[in-house]
Structures are given as C-alpha cells and as structure tokens.
Curated annotation (Swiss-Prot):
The keyword RNA-binding applies. Binds directly to 23S ribosomal RNA and is necessary for the in vitro assembly process of the 50S ribosomal subunit. It is not involved in the protein synthesizing functions of that subunit. Belongs to the bacterial ribosomal protein bL20 family. HAMAP family: Ribosomal_bL20 (MF_00382). GO terms for molecular function: rRNA binding; structural constituent of ribosome. It comes from Morus indica (Mulberry). This is Large ribosomal subunit protein bL20c. CDD domains: Ribosomal_L20.
Length: 117
C-alpha cells in the first residue's frame, strides 16, 4: 500500500478543533481525541440550554408579573389576570406584561382596571 501524504489538511482540522477547545481545562484542551469528545458534549449542552433558556425566561416573566400583581392586590393571582385577559381578547404576551410590570406599573394597573369593567 502506498503512503498518502496529506500533511497540512489533517493539521488544519485539528488546529480548528483546538481553537474551539482552547478555553477547556487540562487534557480537554490538549489531546485531540478528548477535544473532539468534549466538543460534541459542549455542542449538545448548548443545544439543550437553548431550549432551557426559553423555559427559564418564561418562568421569570410569570414570576415578575405575579409579584407586581400580588404586591398591590390588583388581582389575587397571576392566573386570574391571564384568564381575564384572554376573556377580554387582550392578547399581550408575558414578555410584554413583565416589561410593563417592571418599568411602568401604572400602565399595568390601567390594563387591569379595563379588564374589571
């Protein structure tokens, strides 16, 4: 069998992987096999965390809305506010409601008063 000389192509591939893993600790940034394994794990974790991030932000928005509502007794709970919003067909998403709750509470009170009428 003849020898295949492909020197710089494999080196380029390995250096690209090494640049990705340059911030990893120990052998995970030095040994090629462990670098490739860690790269796969890192990308899998990044994919999972993008889904988790969406859930976490939704939980944060709900918590913020609920805190403002309960603090000033506009409604008894978050769920009743959302229920009445849907009943009145005021389709404001939770992200916008959380921004209103933090930055301009009076506006949230005006919205809740409109629902009560």
């Amino acid at each position: 069998m003849t020898r295949i000389k492909r020197g710089y192509i494999a080196r380029r591939r390995r250096t690209k992987i090494r640049l990705f893993a340059s911030s990893f600790q120990g052998a995970r940034s030095r040994l090629t096999r462990t670098i490739t394994q860690q790269k796969i794990r890192a990308l899998v974790s990044a994919h999972q965390d993008r889904g988790r991030q969406k859930r976490d932000f939704r939980r944060l928005w709900i918590t913020r809305i609920n805190a403002v509502i309960r603090a000033n007794k506009v409604y008894y709970s978050y769920s009743t506010l959302i229920h009445h919003l849907y009943k009145r067909q005021l389709l404001l998403n939770r992200k916008i409601l959380a921004q209103i709750a933090i930055l301009n509470r009076n506006c949230l009170y005006m919205i809740s008063n409109e629902i009560l009428k």
